[in-house]
A protein has these predicted regions:
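Exposed beta-sheet edge/beta-hairpin loop segments within beta-rich domains
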Residues: 82-87
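Conserved short "hinge" loops at termini or chain/domain junctions
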Residues: 1-81, 111-132
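Short, hydrophobic/amphipathic alpha-helical patches that form generic packing surfaces
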Residues: 32-35, 90-102
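Charged, low-complexity interaction regions
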Residues: 18, 100-106
Length: 132
């Protein structure tokens, strides 16, 4: 999912609860969501076996693999995709909404965790007909 679309969905979902949020805060919330999600599962986009110079290791996983720290989203580039598996993009969106609600709207956290659990139960495989 494109980073700009993720930002727009977040702003739309939160439009009733908040007025406006600066992009730098949305980026910070997205990074926090990445860390939360990577603590619960192993996104295949971030799973590597060979380390490149510009990559920062987030944590080790099984079979000598590791997760890298994803890049911060760039909302200036309208073609850039969020650096996480497509099926986890809505987990990112919902976790950011949870953070933006200052932890008051736990429905967003519940949705985030359900998406992560679905991802884990499908062994990280993208489903052709999945509707999130």
């Amino acid at each position: 999912m494109k980073s700009v679309l993720v930002r727009d969905i977040i702003l739309k979902k939160m439009s009733k609860e908040r007025t406006s949020v600066d992009d730098k805060f949305i980026k910070a919330y997205i990074m926090e969501a990445f860390y939360y999600i990577c603590g619960k599962c192993e996104p295949s986009v971030l799973t590597k076996t060979i380390r490149e110079d510009d990559q920062v290791v987030l944590r080790n996983t099984r079979n000598n693999a590791f997760l890298i720290v994803p890049d911060e989203p760039n909302f200036e580039d309208e073609q850039e995709h969020l650096m996480i598996d497509e099926s986890l993009c809505y987990a990112v969106i919902n976790y950011v909404c949870f953070l933006m609600s200052k932890g008051e709207n736990v429905m967003y956290l519940k949705l985030c965790n359900e998406i992560i659990n679905d991802y884990i139960s499908n062994d990280g495989k993208e489903l052709e007909n999945a509707h999130l």
